[in-house]
Design a protein with these regions (language model features):
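Canonical Rossmann dinucleotide-binding motif of NAD(H)/NADP(H)-dependent dehydrogenases/reductases
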Residues: 2-33
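The beta1-alpha1 cofactor-binding region of Rossmann-like NAD(H)/NADP(H)-dependent oxidoreductases
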Residues: 39-40, 57-69, 104
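Conserved Rossmann-fold SDR core element
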Residues: 81, 170, 180-189
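Conserved mid-core segment of classical short-chain dehydrogenase/reductases
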Residues: 90-108, 127, 131-139, 158-161
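A short, exposed helix-loop element centered on a Lys and neighboring polar residues
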Residues: 122-123, 174
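Alpha-helical segment proximal to the catalytic Tyr-Lys
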Residues: 127, 178-179
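Residue(s) in the substrate-gating loop at a strand-loop-helix junction
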Residues: 149
Length: 189
């Protein structure tokens, strides 16, 4: 896919891998909507990146907010060409730690953000991407990138929740790639 002039959403876009991805896409001539919960960092990065960047504070696990967000993207940009899912959390917690056992609520929070949030974003992104035919000279409508981790295969002590979440992201990406290939949408980790 040629990046120049394309519209991308980058979750976790205010810092880390998401911010680096946004910088790279902007450098290639894309328009990028940064999605993050950290408003201060998101707005700062938007100013740094200039007119081709927009920031939106969004909880990727909120179904209604995400649906509304993609409606706004379509209204403003008329299309979507890509989604890069970088939003995630990676707290360290041992199952049998000094302060007690691993909290179930923390485990569920990690899975909710890293897995459910990724799925929530990609399903609405796929719906929008599939509405539009590939641009002239291109074979695919768009691309969805889900951030995985070596922790999916080789998790370390204290990474139980994070490793489980990344294993789930890896596991859902292949069937999604097979399904969405029919819609000319590439999905990968």
């Amino acid at each position: 896919m040629k990046i120049q002039g394309k519209v991308f959403v980058v979750t976790g876009g205010a810092s880390g891998l998401g911010a680096a991805t946004a910088r790279h896409l902007i450098g290639q001539g894309a328009k990028v909507i940064l999605v993050d919960m950290n408003q201060a960092l998101g707005e700062e990065l938007q100013r740094e990146l200039g007119e081709n960047a927009q920031f939106k504070s969004l909880d990727v696990t909120d179904e209604q907010a995400v649906q509304s967000f993609f409606q706004e993207v379509e209204a403003e940009y008329g299309q979507l060409n890509g989604l890069v899912n970088c939003a995630g959390v990676a707290p360290s917690a041992k199952v049998l730690g000094r302060d007690g056992i691993h909290e179930l609520a923390l485990f569920q929070k990690v899975l909710n953000i890293n897995v459910s949030g990724t799925f929530n974003m990609l399903r609405f992104a796929a719906q929008l991407i599939a509405k539009y035919e590939p641009q002239v000279g291109e074979e695919e409508r768009g691309v969805i990138v889900n951030t995985a981790s070596v922790a999916a295969y080789d998790g370390q002590i204290g990474q139980t929740a994070y490793a489980a979440s990344k294993g789930a992201v890896v596991s859902m990406t292949l069937p999604l790639a097979r399904e969405l290939a029919r819609e000319k949408i590439r999905v990968m980790t």
